[in-house]
Amino acid sequence: MPAEWEPHEAVWLAWPHDTTSFPYLEEAEAAFASFIREIHESERVELLVLDAAMKERVVAMLRVRRVELSRIRVHIRDYADIWFRDYGPIFVVNRPASQLAMTKWIFNAWGNKYPTLLKDNQIPCGMNESLRLPIFEPGVVMEGGSIEVNGCGSLITTEQCLLNPNRNAGMSKAEIENYLREYLGVRHFIWLREGIAGDDTDGHIDDIARFVNPTTVLCARQPDENDPDHAVLEENFRLLEAATDQDGNKLRVVPLPVPGWVGDEQGRLPASYANFYIGNTKVLVPLFDTENDAAALETIQSVFPDRKVVGINARYLVYGLGTFHCMTQQQPAV
């Protein structure tokens, strides 16, 4: 499994449409369109829409934003939600043979929390009708947002998610590691504990800690001891500081600011600057109209000297309980 900063052929997305997930749908669509505008210049966009009417409306929105439509491929598919990172395939590469393949894991809507979203488990097979790639199916439950790799053999994940009985009940840590070795080509595992408050995925790593190069990890840190995320994130930070890469080298762990409390009267939302997407030439970062937005952009730019870091307001997108990394799945170039 390549690291996210390795070259992409395309990025896969699914246009938001459900007002249950996105009560501020118009604002969420605007953030989504802004994301496409920024990313399409350096990697092709493969975009799912529900029907011809949605396609026409979406194309019009992108045209207004001066998106080069020849770089957008629109696919009409039946899908429930936009979280491609979790229900989409995880692409893998055989570098000596220059061959691309996909691994198709079982998506059970984060522990069967949302029965209406279970149909998104079929998206990878639908994609492969046109891609026609070799497809490998481990037969176990896993979401792309629960793992983070450096492309050299190391993988970071959380016990809260991968060992959760609502995913693969009865499966041991060693058994899960064996599946990850066999299907993703990793050999070294860094297990963190738990995720952030408001995260319905049971502790996905892409809201906590992200590799930015083979030996450097950005890790969210909450200095406010009264915040429920403080203790959790401090423990994760300490675990990363004590960890090594696949060759036994210590990792450089860089603290990443957190937005703080983002939400409404119904509760806290899983807002995290760590949910950025690493494109071919840009890193797209979710912003939340909080005092730490600027500091987060500065921190992320410092670890990506060869890419432009772009912030996009995702305050209304996060009502769907995710942002840019959650909604994307990169297709590696071979």
Regions found by a protein language model. Name each.
Residues 1-334:
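The feature marks the mature, well-folded catalytic cores of soluble enzymes
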